[in-house]
């Protein structure tokens, strides 16, 4: 079992790094875990729609270059499927019983994900209709993946 979290941009704040490190340690009991950061595209503040698409395309190319062909890709999208923690556990477990053992979760940059990345996605996941900083989403995602494994194993977890 392998979980990859593929994300645009680097974590800078120590507190986010510490939270990620804690959940990486916990999750390692259930799965190999890798976090891959691709550089975000430098862009001016007030971009035209065309410039936004160009930024998303460049970031998307960087993301797709890191996705293994056999990996099940789960993109985080505002318009994705909203699940409970138990629902996420069932989704992962269902895919595992069908022989899928390599999962890549993709978190886009501040402008979202390019169409090419969305087209490569096997499942669109949403945690909320709200927008969150991608640094925070990394922590929320890794915690929920950890929680999903606890649920799948029938182990106690904090509700």
From Swiss-Prot:
Catalytic activity, EC: 2.1.1.177
CDD domains found in the cross-reference section: RlmH-like (cd18081)
GO cellular component: cytoplasm
Catalysed reactions, as listed in the record: pseudouridine(1915) in 23S rRNA + S-adenosyl-L-methionine = N(3)-methylpseudouridine(1915) in 23S rRNA + S-adenosyl-L-homocysteine + H(+)
Gene Ontology terms for molecular function: rRNA (pseudouridine-N3-)-methyltransferase activity
Gene3D superfamilies with a match to the protein in the record: 3.40.1280.10
Binding sites annotated in the UniProt record for S-adenosyl-L-methionine: 76, 108, 127-132
Domain of life, source organism: Bacteria
Main location: cytoplasm
Keyword annotations from UniProtKB, A to Z: Cytoplasm, Methyltransferase, rRNA processing, S-adenosyl-L-methionine, Transferase
Compartments, as annotated in UniProt: Cytoplasm
One Pfam family here: SPOUT_MTase
Free-text function comment from the UniProt entry: Specifically methylates the pseudouridine at position 1915 (m3Psi1915) in 23S rRNA.
Protein family: Belongs to the RNA methyltransferase RlmH family.
PANTHER family listed in its UniProt record: METHYLTRANSFERASE, RIBOSOMAL RNA LARGE SUBUNIT METHYLTRANSFERASE H
Assembly behavior: Homodimer.
Name this protein carries in UniProt: Ribosomal RNA large subunit methyltransferase H
